């Protein structure tokens, strides 16, 4: 995808997004309908709504010089500061994130779309698809740690996921997709990984990024989960799979990075969280989380 910021005058700004012609139209339609549905629920934060063209379509076919046909769409621009740019994330910010994710998931509880029933490389419910990449990790100690993370996901998450509540989730709520104003979440962007999943995978994806680099990763997780729980109460079964889901997401992040390094080891955007992912995996392994330890007591939520 290629994105351009469009200044339309009088303070109006939009994002002009060009996508490959091979992007399934059903996925784009799903994103449009999902955002419209969620935005109608008065979330308290903004979503990047897609504007229709003069023909009433959400995409327009274009042809760039020397390129094949592409498709483009115009999206509302949300003015805010990326959470990723914050060097110090406060407890208030983490609680705002937990509430925002819960509000978003509640807004989608009565929404479904056939295109969301899919698999992709970042699908946390299928983290095991990347286990074959273990051989890409040359350091034996790191390879063993990564295998431990996959094993934990297989043993303590995979068998239980089918019985947990399912719905369409955002599935990619990390710092580059969360917009802030002060200490409050004001926007959620990038719906390219939305899929029908166990709802708890929303937290399973987001928590690792909020725990990475934090002096007290357990408290960071507790802040987000407790705020989420107040809006959309979690079951004990959902909480029980959080640690293995976090390990699964970290394993996927590391595995995809290892695969990408074989393609372009100098890419500026592919490896930003890799080192911190290893550090958090070490922390979880060294502190008994593979032996049944939980991030928090359910009673403390």
Which residues fall in each region the model found?
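Activation segment
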Residues: 21, 80, 186, 194-196, ...
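A cross-family kinase active-site recognition segment
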Residues: 54, 86-142, 166, 271
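Active-site acidic catalytic loop and adjacent metal/ATP-binding pocket
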Residues: 1-8, 15-16, 50, 154-201
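ATP-binding pocket architecture of kinase catalytic cores
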Residues: 9-112
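Active-site activation/catalytic loop segments of kinase-like enzymes and analogous catalytic loops
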Residues: 200-233, 247-265
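A glycine-centered beta->alpha junction motif in the catalytic cores
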Residues: 56, 68, 72-86, 127-137, ...
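ATP/Mg2+ or Mg2+-diphosphate-binding catalytic cores
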Residues: 135-136, 253-301
């Amino acid at each position: 995808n290629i994105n351009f910021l469009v200044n339309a005058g009088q303070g109006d700004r939009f994002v002009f997004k060009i996508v490959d012609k091979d992007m399934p139209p059903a996925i784009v339609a799903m994103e449009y309908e999902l955002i419209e549905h969620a935005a109608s629920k008065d979330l308290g934060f903004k979503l990047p709504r897609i504007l229709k063209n003069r023909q009433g379509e959400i995409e327009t076919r274009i042809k760039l010089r020397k390129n094949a046909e592409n498709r483009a769409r115009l999206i509302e621009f949300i003015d805010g500061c990326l959470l990723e740019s914050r060097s110090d994330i406060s407890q208030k910010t983490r609680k705002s994130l937990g509430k925002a994710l819960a509000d978003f998931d509640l807004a989608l509880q009565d929404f479904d779309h056939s295109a969301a029933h899919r698999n992709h490389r970042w699908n946390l419910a299928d983290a095991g698809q990347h286990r074959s990449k273990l051989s890409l990790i040359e350091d034996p100690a790191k390879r063993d740690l990564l295998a431990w993370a996959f094993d934990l996901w297989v043993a303590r998450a995979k068998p239980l996921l089918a019985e947990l509540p399912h719905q369409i989730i955002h599935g990619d709520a990390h710092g580059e997709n969360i917009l802030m104003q002060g200490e409050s979440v004001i926007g959620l962007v990038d719906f390219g990984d939305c899929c029908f999943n166990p709802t708890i995978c929303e937290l399973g994806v987001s928590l690792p990024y909020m725990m990475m680099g934090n002096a007290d990763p357990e408290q960071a997780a507790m802040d987000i989960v407790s705020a989420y729980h107040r809006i959309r109460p979690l079951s004990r079964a959902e909480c029980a799979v959080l640690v293995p889901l976090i390990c699964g997401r970290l394993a996927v992040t590391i595995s995809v990075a290892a695969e990408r390094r074989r393609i372009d080891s100098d890419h500026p955007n592919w490896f930003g969280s890799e080192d911190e992912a290893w550090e958090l995996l070490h922390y979880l392994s060294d502190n008994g989380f593979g032996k049944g330890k939980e991030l928090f007591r359910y009673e403390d939520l």
